[in-house]
């Protein structure tokens, strides 16, 4: 597709771009006869005068028209029909661009129907994904990949994930109680690290130590578990197959925590109780455990399609986020390679998910944050309370500076703009397009220095708002003109297409714009 060729971008330092993709062009292209998926109704995209898009240096004009079909098909112009998402490469990743909670799970759930394998590569139960099935039932997943609702998909929890088994089994029990069969469809890496209750306790003690400088952790034990991994006294899933040495390793973890934190008391009885619990877990987990590095790479060699579901988001990345107010893993593109054992040159499409505005849970700098009634109005409209913690999310305008930074790091090929419907009815909408220092100097990129970030003045563009309810819209052309201009201005500022546009929580509330 002309659009796909224009949008393809190499992952910086990871995926080598082809010479063709790197060439600059000013040619104007037309999107012709490409139906796209939107749940119950489908779209046929054709050339027209509506919806100008700038992709790198390529101008594209498209008009979407709704059609009805029994399945998602596309007219290729050669008499053959193909699925609207068939242009996606063998390996596709869906990553967050902001501070999490962008709605990645919904796109993964939709795309999972077209992929053989859905894999998670990093993070733990701090990644809350909310998805809905065809009956409208809500599922809040934290460890299990969102593709689990598609019965033909195999879900993989990779080596880069930290796993709290009590929570993991609770998710499985909840899924199966609602008729979702996980047997033989859910695989756990033998290299993944186990997250124990003591990690969660230590997480809370660490936050208490920081007092007024708290990071705002979810207290799910993610950081302490990755710390155990880094100092090499962590316990891996594969260790459950060697229970004769498991207690000794567990004892070391308990003693280490007691030595570090005054509030943590070591006792042999506590170690024994944990050991007794994990003997039971070992038996139940056994049929889930595999060498996922071998499984994923074998699946790739066999031509199977692999979808990678990112947890958290780029601005929470331990290397690129607002450190130290970040997570303890790499939710950016590099985490895919280290968290699954997949070579960089095998990565294909990388879709960045961004809310039409910005939210953040917990502490840390947030330049476009809205306070008072404005922030509360946006929070209520978007139901912005954390999936994992239930904490109210901080809300603000879309931060283009941060979004461009995420695009640079990850080499996204397209953007999934979510929750556009939340902006309906607001008196005005704004985009934070630049940062300026106190002296008025415009910053070239997102700063690492938090003292600078906390003092920047955001330069905004104010755009015309729209009053119409767009939750039933399934065609880009049917969006209010003001909403289209908002989308197109974002595309101009980041140089990428907003190919997927979310207009509501349900599976069908998606416009695919080609």
Swiss-Prot record:
Does the record bear GTP-binding in its keywords? yes
Query: What keyword terms does UniProt attach to this protein?
Result: Chloroplast, GTP-binding, Ligase, Magnesium, Metal-binding, Nucleotide-binding, Plastid, Purine biosynthesis, Transit peptide
| EC primary class | ligase
| Record flagged with keyword GTP-binding | yes
* Enzyme Commission number(s) from the entry: 6.3.4.4
- Where does this protein hold IMP? 101-104, 126-129, 218, 232, 312, 327, 391
Q: Which cofactor does it need?
A: Mg(2+)
GO molecular function terms noted in the UniProt entry: adenylosuccinate synthase activity; GTP binding; magnesium ion binding
Q: Where in the cell is it found?
A: Plastid, Chloroplast
Which of this chain's residues are annotated to bind GTP? 100-106, 128-130, 393, 419-421, 502-504
Catalyses which reaction(s): IMP + L-aspartate + GTP = N(6)-(1,2-dicarboxyethyl)-AMP + GDP + phosphate + 2 H(+)
| Alphabetized SUPFAM superfamilies for the sequence | P-loop containing nucleoside triphosphate hydrolases
The UniProt record gives the binding positions of Mg(2+) as: 101, 128
The pathway that the record names for this protein is: Purine metabolism; AMP biosynthesis via de novo pathway; AMP from IMP: step 1/2
Task: Identify which residues the record assigns to the active site.
Answer: 101, 129
Entry binding sites for substrate = 387-393
GO CC annotations on file:
chloroplast; cytoplasm
A single GO BP annotation from the record? 'de novo' AMP biosynthetic process
> What HAMAP family does the annotation carry?
Adenylosucc_synth
Q: Which family does it belong to?
A: Belongs to the adenylosuccinate synthetase family.
Q: How does it assemble?
A: Homodimer.
Task: Please explain the role this protein plays, according to its UniProt record.
Answer: Plays an important role in the de novo pathway and in the salvage pathway of purine nucleotide biosynthesis. Catalyzes the first committed step in the biosynthesis of AMP from IMP.
Q: What is this protein called?
A: Adenylosuccinate synthetase 1, chloroplastic
Q: Which organism is it from?
A: Physcomitrium patens
């Amino acid at each position: 597709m002309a659009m796909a060729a224009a949008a393809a971008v190499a992952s910086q330092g990871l995926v080598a771009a082809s010479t063709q993709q790197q060439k600059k062009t000013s040619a104007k292209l037309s999107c012709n006869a490409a139906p796209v998926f939107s749940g119950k109704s489908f779209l046929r995209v054709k050339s027209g005068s509506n919806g100008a898009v700038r992709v790198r240096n390529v101008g594209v004009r498209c008009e979407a028209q709704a059609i009805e079909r029994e399945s998602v098909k596309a007219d290729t112009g050669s008499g053959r029909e193909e699925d609207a998402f068939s242009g996606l490469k063998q390996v596709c990743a869906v990553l967050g661009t902001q501070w999490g909670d962008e709605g990645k799970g919904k796109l993964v759930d939709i795309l999972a129907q077209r992929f053989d394998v859905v894999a998670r590569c990093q993070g733990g139960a701090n990644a809350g994904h909310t998805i809905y099935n065809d009956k409208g039932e809500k599922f809040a997943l934290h460890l299990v990949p969102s593709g689990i609702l598609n019965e033909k998909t195999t879900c993989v929890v990779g080596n880069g994930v930290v796993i709290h088994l009590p929570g993991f089994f609770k998710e499985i029990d909840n899924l199966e109680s609602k008729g979702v069969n996980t047997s033989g469809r859910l695989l756990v890496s033998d290299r993944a690290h186990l997250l124990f209750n003591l990690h969660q306790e230590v997480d809370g003690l660490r936050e208490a130590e920081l007092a007024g400088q708290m990071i705002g952790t979810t207290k799910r034990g993610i950081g302490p578990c990755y710390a155990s991994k880094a100092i090499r006294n962590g316990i891996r899933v594969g260790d459950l197959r060697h229970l004769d040495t498991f207690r000794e390793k567990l004892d070391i973890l308990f003693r280490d925590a007691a030595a570090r934190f005054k509030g943590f008391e070591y006792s042999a009885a506590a170690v024994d109780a944990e050991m007794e619990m994990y003997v039971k877990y070992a038996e139940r987990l056994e049929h889930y455990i595999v060498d996922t590095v071998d499984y994923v790479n074998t699946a790739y060699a066999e031509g199977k399609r692999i979808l990678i579901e990112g947890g958290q988001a780029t601005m929470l990345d331990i290397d690129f986020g607002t450190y130290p107010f970040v997570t303890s893993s790499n939710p950016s593109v590099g985490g895919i390679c280290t968290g699954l054992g997949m070579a960089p040159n095998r990565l294909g499409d990388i879709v960045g998910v961004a809310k039409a505005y910005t939210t953040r849970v917990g502490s840390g700098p947030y330049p476009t944050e809205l306070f008072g009634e404005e922030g509360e109005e946006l929070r209520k409209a978007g139901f912005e309370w954390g999936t994992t913690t239930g904490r109210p999310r901080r809300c603000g305008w879309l931060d283009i500076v941060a979004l461009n930074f995420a695009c640079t790091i990850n080499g996204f090929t397209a953007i999934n703009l979510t929750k556009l419907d939340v902006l309906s009815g607001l008196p005005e909408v704004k985009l934070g397009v630049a940062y300026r220092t106190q002296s008025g100097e415009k910053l070239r990129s997102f700063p690492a220095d938090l003292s600078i970030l906390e003092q920047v003045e955001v330069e905004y563009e104010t755009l015309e708002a729209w009053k119409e309810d767009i939750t039933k819209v399934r065609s880009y052309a049917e969006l209010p003109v003001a909403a289209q201009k908002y989308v197109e201005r974002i595309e101009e500022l980041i140089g990428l297409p907003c190919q997927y546009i979310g207009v509501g929580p349900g599976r069908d509330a998606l416009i695919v714009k080609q």
